[in-house]
């Protein structure tokens, strides 16, 4: 989990490309 990107109401952090990226739920 982390800061929610602009324009994203509900997000979950997932491991992608060796890093954690916010993905819209």
From Swiss-Prot:
The keyword Hydrolase applies. One of its GO terms (molecular function) is lysozyme activity. Signal peptide: none annotated. It comes from the Eukaryota. Residues 1-25 form the I-type lysozyme domain. GO terms for biological process: defense response to bacterium; killing of cells of another organism. Its EC number is 3.2.1.17. It catalyses: Hydrolysis of (1->4)-beta-linkages between N-acetylmuramic acid and N-acetyl-D-glucosamine residues in a peptidoglycan and between N-acetyl-D-glucosamine residues in chitodextrins. Keywords: Antimicrobial, Bacteriolytic enzyme, Glycosidase, Hydrolase. Belongs to the glycosyl hydrolase 22 family. Type-I lysozyme subfamily. This is Lysozyme.
């Amino acid at each position: 989990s982390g800061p929610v990107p602009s324009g994203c109401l509900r997000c979950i952090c997932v491991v992608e490309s060796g890093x954690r990226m916010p993905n819209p739920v």
